[in-house]
Amino acid sequence: MTYTISRAEQVLQTQRQALNLRWYPHYHLAARAGWINDPNGLVWFDGWYHAFYQHHPYSTQWGPMHWGHARSKDLVHWEHLPVALAPEGPEDKDGCFSGSAVVDGDTLELIYTGHKFHGDPGDEANLYQVQCLATSRDGIHFERQGMVVDTPPGMHHFRDPKVWREGDCWYMIVGAREGDTGQVRLYRSADLRQWQDAGVLDEAESTMGYMWECPDFFTLNGKRVLMFSPQGMQAAGFSNRNLFQSGYLIGEWQPGQRFIRHGEFREMDNGHDFYAPQSFSTPDGRRIVIGWLDMWESPLPEQQDGWAGMLSLPRELSLSADDRLQMRPAKEVESLRGAWFPWPVSTLNNQQTTMVDNCEAMEVNLRWDCARSSAEQYGLRFGDGLRIYMDAQQQRLVLERHYPQYGLCGTRSVPLTAGADLNLRIFFDSSSVEVFVNDGEACLSSRIYPQAPRRELALFAWSGAAALTEAGAWQLE
């Protein structure tokens, strides 16, 4: 098949009309139809926030990657734009893989991975991944400039460039695999076209994965943050439970030096579905991150409905006093709020109480006084398939989903400080939940698949009492 932007647009127009919207998001960004995965090219340009994304418009399965495109004035209300890149070759004939965007003067520049096979695609020895450039003056139509960084000798997995400006130079990091070792490689340039190899910024130790995808590198509170998505890390206890992870290292770096780590790798989001996050800086200097709200090799029931995958809410990043990355919903998310429904504040004693009969798009705010709560489990139930609760015996907040008909069952959890209040902001959309714990202390994000009409929200406390001190919900529009 020959891939072009015009052909992709024709297919999307047709497929959009046939969608089943039962699980399609109300306020998260998803493709018009077809497949979406990694967010790409997050940037502010010419008065708009732009979000590109990995996209296969021809089916709900992963396939030759295009770059989908949307823009927004406020990070929450998105306008779909034409597909920005199609794998038209020769450098990207088998896919336009992930990358980033920068503004150079009056030009928006996309730096992305050209994915191609020289020979049988079933033989990894034939895989080549190179870094390519495309430019635009209007932010919508892009002119392909071809390859700007070739594959290092002997390497096959070399993808997901992230570019930034520092001093008089442009810098690029690229995720790579050297044998069975994940690494991040560094390049520098004066003009975004001629790049010099600056060596390896950092690489995995034996337990840190065979491939580091989607790297990002930025400064918070004077510290350098290396964010990436490692493949090949083994689960250990409550950690690394997903097939692949997304997390970060904190450290120091100066141009011309190697990254010096301070501390260990930490996961960013402890839910079932969060991968390939990318960050960018807003005009007022905030660092915002958006991730793919799904996980590789996990069932996607919405594929039968004509679409697959979605992106997370925009989240503002900060660094805690003990150098932990914190995520909170970007302030723009509050513009979605409609009516406020206060819930009665009370002590629940071995009971369950329905608060909302039909939750489609809501933000729920809860505060529990854990010191005055004796229940073994207390929290929130959504329909028949989701519970978000405090497990007092383990001192952990648990997200439990149970959709056996789709093969989606299991728990994810984070530790909590004994006796402290538990403050939750929980965002429900048609097929997703994002839980923000204690103003950025932790986050759990998962896809959910409730069956109509079982979308009620209920508070519960079992084997004892639980003290609820603040409660209510915003209708999101």
Annotate the PLM regions.
Residues M1-P161, R165-W212, T219-N270, G291-P342, ...:
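Beta-rich carbohydrate-recognition and catalytic domains
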Residues E213-P215, P277:
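Repeated scaffold domains used in trafficking and secretory/extracellular systems
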Residues E9-Q15, F244-E477:
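Beta-rich accessory regions
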